[in-house]
Structures are given as structure tokens and as C-alpha cells.
Amino acid sequence: MTIPIVLVAPKIPSNTGNIIRLCANSGAQLHLVRPLGFELDDKKLRPAGLDYHEYAHLQVHDDWAMTKQALQAAGCDIITALTTKLSKPFYDYDFSGQTTDQSDNQSTTSPSSNHVALVFGSETAGLPDDIRADIGADNWLRLPMLADSRSLNLSNSVAICLYEVWRQQGFDGDEGRSIGYETLTVYDPK
């Protein structure tokens, strides 16, 4: 199961580089929505992602409408927005796709209910109001933070959320091993 991650107008290349690496290591698909605050060949983007760019599934869209269309075409049943606005806590959301049959109390997987996209706004402005409205307040989620905190780093937020969704879905695709550093290419900034 591929988990779509959507970054709307990301500004900081190193954050996106980290998220590219995260997506490559988890099998998630990354969707970037223009305008971007950098070029995809930006030198600041590359070091954070090391040589993972070739392993990541990346799509760039001109606007939210095109992104939403691509998500729906890929079978996304639920689109969630991560926001600092009033919303339900991320940990209260069930991403597992498990439903319980009340007659025999058995848990089963519902294939139509576990394909969820996680949408994040830019580091500086968050998600635009129109995109949050389009997603709908029932699907607004927030990560817990202390009362005086403004926000978490974008790449940290994506990592927390992606791994929780993947955990709830049984870490589908994980083989319990890593290829190790011996196969990585060292970044050469020249």
C-alpha cells in the first residue's frame, strides 16, 4: 500500500530533501504542489535526500485541483489535512482500514477505507484556507504539542505522521532489513 504524502507550496529545500528520503525508505509517494520555493535540482535539496531521489516516487502538480484529481485516480478514499487549526488529534484517527463485524467481533480489513493521503502546508504559511475547506473539517488533524508551541518542523511532522499511518497498516512492505550504507553514493557538491 503506497501512502501519498502531499506538500503544498513547500519553501525549504532541505525539508523536502529529507521527505524525499523518508518516502524512498517507506514506499510513500510524494506529491509536490506548486509554487515551490526552490528548483528540484537545488543544491540544498540534494544533500538532505542523499542519493534517494532515484528511489522516491515523486509527482509535481501545478495546483491543488490537479493534485486532488491524481489522488482520487490513485484510489485515495480519504484526504486528511495536517493543521495547527482546531482539529482532532492525529492519534485519534484510525488509518488501519480495520472494521469490526459486530456479529462476531472479528476485525477485518476494508480495502476501500485504508487508502489515505496526508496533506501538509508550507513551512511559512501552512495550508491555504481554500484547500483546508475543500478537504473538510472532519479530516483536519493536528499533532499534539505544548500550548505555547507554534508548529513542528515540516519534515519531522511528515515523518511522525507517515510512520504512524504505516504502523497502523502493519508496515506493509517492510522486510525487516536495510540495504546498509555500503550501497549509498556519497554526495559530491561539485
Feature roles, as predicted:
Residues 3-15:
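Short, glycine-rich nucleotide/cofactor-binding loops
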Residues 14-27:
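Histidine-anchored nucleotide/phosphate-binding helix
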Residues 8-9, 34, 56, 141-147:
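Short beta->alpha connector loops at strand-helix junctions that form conserved
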Residues 42-129:
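S-adenosyl-L-methionine/SAH cofactor-binding core of RNA-modifying enzymes
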Residues 134-187:
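Structured adenosyl-cofactor binding patch, chiefly the S-adenosyl-L-methionine
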Residues 29-35:
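Short internal beta-strands
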Residues 26, 48, 134-136:
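Short, structured coil segments at secondary-structure junctions
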Residues 4, 28-29, 78:
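Residues at the starts of beta-strands that form the adenosine-phosphate
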